[in-house]
């Protein structure tokens, strides 16, 4: 094998925790190599060592047989290592050309920025990728997929021979993900070695050649994709056989009261009119393609965005939800799609995040907070939702994706919200944590909570939801329940708009 990268005996500790112990990883030139493991398995730490962001306590890095010691990210880049982070490192108001050459602009013999030469070079890079990018448009005006391609182009412009792709499909549509896979296959043909990090096992089998699995900071195994299956990979990642990750659906009570009724919701003046109802103890799925209006509908209901007209009843009482504060007072909570930027203050502790929108509950005097009472409540809700952390004072930024999501849920339970809107609740979460989130959702509905679940994961919609409202172009095309909820039926309504069910509340 033509080995381009070899990591041997990599060990790394942080105060109070051993993040990596004797890790081995070998990458062959021109292969796509998956790095798998639950959140907290050590994948990010290992990649940060490869990129020079962290230095190992022990072990060696070899590129093309030569030992390397990276003391900075620039050292790694100079050695041919590039990374496309899950959170983009682009400047939104700059165009693609300026983002590609930021900090290393090409100049004329007189020291002036040579925009024309940089533009030609950028065009050549995107031609190599086979993508069409408006070179003069600010990045913020491009689609998420196009921004992803700019990130990849930026790494290639630095002559990356080893490319790390960290959850690159997390915010892409299926069609955009397929385009990305085509680009990866072309780069593979050109001899670029890629390390692909993803929680979507179907993507691993679609595009990767080999897989290395980490668990609890330790090396588990490396295997060819053709020699394994999903069940074996899951067992290697979690250390046990994972039964069906979806809890059994309970028998739906026919007389369950409607806790949220939305009538005549019209977001735009000339847009479609939608109606739906949510009952106590159920999970109502919002399914459809990206851009079909699922999230937009939820945000309009709680007043986070304007609606041309809407009528809402909460537990049978008319409610004027003009803004999220009104929704909060009505007992409606939102777990937003982007938990890190919209759902959490990641620099705050777990305690501060959980009590953030309910500080009045802990006021002991006019301006003082009862910290002991706050701590007791925080411990209680952390236990109820299963947050795993050293203490209530742990900074949320240090938690895994699954535990961060549980902190958001804990905040709403602390506020006694009984209607919860989960927008892409398992995005960026490993298989074990997904099963925990699913179990928690069923525990909540068993206690009478009502949940709207917005998800682009079709198996999630089918496996978790008691009823499903399928969206297409802003309209609820069908409301499915029981045996009607299957992948083919959902996708038929989402793509073809076949109206097999009513638009009225079920």
Swiss-Prot record:
Biological role stated in the UniProt entry: Part of the ABC transporter complex RbsABC involved in ribose import. Responsible for energy coupling to the transport system.
Sequence positions that bind ATP: 37-44
One example GO MF annotation: ATP hydrolysis activity
Assembly and binders: The complex is composed of an ATP-binding protein (RbsA), two transmembrane proteins (RbsC) and a solute-binding protein (RbsB).
InterPro entries: AAA+_ATPase, ABC_carbohydrate_import_ATPase, ABC_transporter-like_ATP-bd, ABC_transporter-like_CS, P-loop_NTPase
Keywords: ATP-binding, Cell inner membrane, Cell membrane, Membrane, Nucleotide-binding, Repeat, Sugar transport, Translocase, Transport
Protein name: Ribose import ATP-binding protein RbsA 2
Reactions it catalyzes: D-ribose(out) + ATP + H2O = D-ribose(in) + ADP + phosphate + H(+)
Enzyme Commission number(s) from the entry: 7.5.2.7
Bilayer topology annotation: Peripheral membrane protein
Organism: Burkholderia ambifaria (strain ATCC BAA-244 / DSM 16087 / CCUG 44356 / LMG 19182 / AMMD)
Statement: the UniProt record of this protein carries the keyword Cell cycle: no
UniProt-listed Gene3D superfamilies: P-loop containing nucleotide triphosphate hydrolases
UniProt similarity note: Belongs to the ABC transporter superfamily. Ribose importer (TC 3.A.1.2.1) family.
Top-tier EC class: translocase
Gene for this chain: rbsA2
Cellular localisation: Cell inner membrane
Pfam families registered for this protein in UniProt: ABC_tran
One GO term describing the cellular component: plasma membrane
CDD domains found in the cross-reference section: ABC_Carb_Monos_I, ABC_Carb_Monos_II
Entry-linked SMART domains: AAA
